[in-house]
């Protein structure tokens, strides 16, 4: 018969240590098992790990040291662009001299000469800048050139970065955008096609999307309370009318990037063809007169088509053995005329397609 005293006796020191050891092993195995299961069912785990590695690499490239980042800030940091790796300068942008001058005065100067304006609230850089106008007119180029000239860290924010399947994660990512930008200031948060992200709110918006937008705007407002903060949200859009009125209020500095006029088109053509093999008799003013309604990207594509005509003629007129001996002839006026006609037909066809869809709707 077992006496009751046997069950009530105190554990020995070795038994206590053994029990603690077994509980520790059990807890560790349970933790890592659950963690492995969560990682296994998360389809974005691999992308998150790769994003973290990319973020750490970028942070080293831009010379950021002794700055601790959270998991969410690391996800945003993967979209950092090193200003030294941005090969866009003002000299790469033609026909927008007035816009460039205004940007230098209102955005770049207050950042580069901060000590001159620290006692004035009126002369601080704006917290929001909107670039709007037709597609292909250089809005993204201007944003990159602004960041490079001002020496700002450039966060190329994609709206998809802020969406997460877990409830509440999108708000944390939105908060990480601003906390990271503040840690890395001076910095520019650039949102291309901002109308797709911060468009007019309506009752049909998903709850998570509405909460994320509200969080984003609330944090954006926080930049205004700290006048020494050098964080700028810069957006580009083709449809400013679709932007929420609250967003427009937060972007008081706006620049209309319109389609280039005659002199602007001539300047753009000179820039595009500056280092190309072009016949000296080509009249770029005449080409500019024939390209009314062309955007900057249209002009570049037109020049590319003209150069390809020379390449195609060279390939068709020579044998494989003589390719190394001959040279491709320079681009001539007639090549540019043919490329213009091709581009006009393409634009007309696209316009007719749009009209057809409108009529069907």
Curated annotation (Swiss-Prot):
Keyword annotations of the record: ATP-binding, Cell membrane, Membrane, Mitochondrion, Mitochondrion outer membrane, Nucleotide-binding, Peroxisome, Phosphoprotein, Postsynaptic cell membrane, Synapse, Translocase, Transmembrane, Transmembrane helix
Modified residues (Phosphoserine): 322
Family matches, as InterPro entries: AAA+_ATPase (IPR003593), AAA_lid_3 (IPR041569), ATPase_AAA_core (IPR003959), ATPase_AAA_CS (IPR003960), Mito_OM_Translocase_MSP1 (IPR051701), P-loop_NTPase (IPR027417)
One term of GO molecular function: ATP binding
Catalytic activity, as annotated: [protein]-with a C-terminal TM segment(out) + ATP + H2O = [protein]-with a C-terminal TM segment(in) + ADP + phosphate + H(+)
Ranges that cross the membrane: 16-32
Keyword Glycoprotein: no
Residues the entry annotates as binding ATP: 133-140
EC number(s) given by UniProt: 7.4.2.-
Cytoplasmic side: 33-361
Disulfide-linked positions: none
Parts of the chain on the Mitochondrial intermembrane side: 1-15
Membrane disposition: Single-pass membrane protein
BP term (GO), one: negative regulation of synaptic transmission, glutamatergic
Subcellular location, record wording: Mitochondrion outer membrane; Peroxisome membrane; Postsynaptic cell membrane
Functional summary from the UniProt entry: Outer mitochondrial translocase required to remove mislocalized tail-anchored transmembrane proteins on mitochondria. Specifically recognizes and binds tail-anchored transmembrane proteins: acts as a dislocase that mediates the ATP-dependent extraction of mistargeted tail-anchored transmembrane proteins from the mitochondrion outer membrane. Also plays a critical role in regulating the surface expression of AMPA receptors (AMPAR), thereby regulating synaptic plasticity and learning and memory.
PANTHER family linked: AAA ATPASE, PUTATIVE (AFU_ORTHOLOGUE AFUA_2G12920)-RELATED-RELATED (PTHR45644), OUTER MITOCHONDRIAL TRANSMEMBRANE HELIX TRANSLOCASE (PTHR45644:SF2)
Quaternary structure and interacting proteins, as annotated: Interacts with GRIA2 and GRIP1 in an ATP-dependent manner. ATAD1-catalyzed ATP hydrolysis disrupts not only its binding to GRIA2 and GRIP1, but also interaction between GRIP1 and GRIA2, leading to AMPAR complex disassembly.
Family: Belongs to the AAA ATPase family. MSP1 subfamily.
Protein name: Outer mitochondrial transmembrane helix translocase
């Amino acid at each position: 018969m077992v006496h009751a005293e046997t069950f009530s006796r105190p554990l020995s020191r070795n038994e206590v240590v053994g029990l603690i050891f077994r509980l520790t092993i059990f807890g560790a195995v349970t933790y890592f098992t659950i963690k492995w299961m969560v990682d296994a069912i998360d389809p974005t785990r691999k992308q998150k790990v790769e994003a973290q590695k990319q973020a750490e690499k970028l942070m080293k490239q831009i010379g950021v040291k002794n700055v601790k980042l959270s998991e969410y800030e690391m996800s945003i940091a993967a979209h950092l662009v090193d200003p030294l790796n941005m090969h866009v300068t003002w000299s790469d942008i033609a026909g927008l001299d007035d816009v460039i001058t205004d940007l230098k005065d209102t955005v770049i100067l207050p950042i580069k000469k901060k000590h001159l304006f620290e006692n004035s609230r009126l002369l601080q850089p704006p917290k929001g800048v909107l670039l709007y106008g037709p597609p292909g007119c250089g809005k993204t180029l201007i944003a990159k050139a602004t960041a490079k000239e001002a020496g700002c860290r450039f966060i190329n924010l994609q709206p998809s970065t802020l969406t997460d399947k877990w409830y509440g994660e999108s708000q944390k990512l939105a908060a990480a955008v601003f906390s990271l930008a503040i840690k890395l200031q001076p910095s520019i948060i650039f949102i291309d096609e901002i109308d797709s992200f911060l468009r007019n709110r309506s009752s049909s918006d998903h709850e998570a999307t509405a909460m994320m937008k509200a969080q984003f705007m609330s944090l954006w407002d926080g930049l205004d309370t700290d006048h020494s903060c050098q964080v700028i949200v810069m957006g580009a859009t083709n449809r400013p009318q679709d932007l929420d009125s609250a967003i427009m209020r937060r972007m008081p500095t706006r620049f209309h990037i319109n389609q280039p006029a005659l002199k602007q088109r001539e300047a753009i053509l000179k820039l595009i063809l500056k280092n190309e093999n072009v016949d000296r008799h080509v009249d770029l003013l005449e080409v500019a007169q024939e390209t009314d309604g062309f955007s900057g990207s249209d002009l570049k594509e037109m020049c590319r088509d003209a150069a390809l005509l020379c390449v195609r003629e060279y390939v068709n007129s020579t044998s494989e053995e003589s390719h190394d001996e001959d040279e491709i002839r320079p681009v001539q006026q007639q090549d540019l005329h043919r490329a213009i006609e091709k581009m006009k037909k393409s634009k007309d066809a696209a316009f007719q397609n749009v009209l057809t869809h409108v009529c069907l709707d």
